[in-house]
Amino acid sequence: MKTTQVICLGEALVDRLGPIGGQLDFKHSYNDFLGGAPANVACGLAKLGAKSAFIGCLGNDSIGQKFCNLFNSRGVNISALQIHESLPTRIVLVARD
């Protein structure tokens, strides 16, 4: 990470938005969005041309792979990213009024 200008350290997670109305029925209707402030900032800075890196931990699962694909497509350095073999990537359940 010698040439990195900004290192973003922290969380990468999925925001799982439930249906409008406040019902927590995530079995049938929800939308997933890749998120987490440090992950978003790393991608945003890279998109603006800065040399950014993300340091955090993802699960060895399909969501973790989506994050890796996103970081790679944006040019974010993930050489210090940790992949946890037995725990999943975090999901935050969001109830909407």
List where the protein language model places each region.
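Positively charged, low-complexity intrinsically disordered leader regions
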Residues: M1-Q23
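Conserved strand-loop elements at the edges of beta-sheets that form or border functional pockets
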Residues: C8, G35-G36, I83
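Gly/Ser/Thr-rich helix-start
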Residues: E11, G36-A37, C57-N60
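Beta-barrel outer-membrane channel/assembly domains of diderm bacteria
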Residues: D15-R16, N40-L48
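Short, glycine/charged-enriched secondary-structure capping and boundary segments
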Residues: G21-D25, C68-L70
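Short pre-catalytic strand/loop immediately N-terminal to key active-site residues, enriched for Gly-Thr
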Residues: D25-G35
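Conserved donor sugar-nucleotide recognition element shared by glycan-biosynthetic enzymes
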Residues: L34-V41, I63
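Conserved N-terminal subdomain of the carbohydrate kinase-like
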Residues: K51-D97
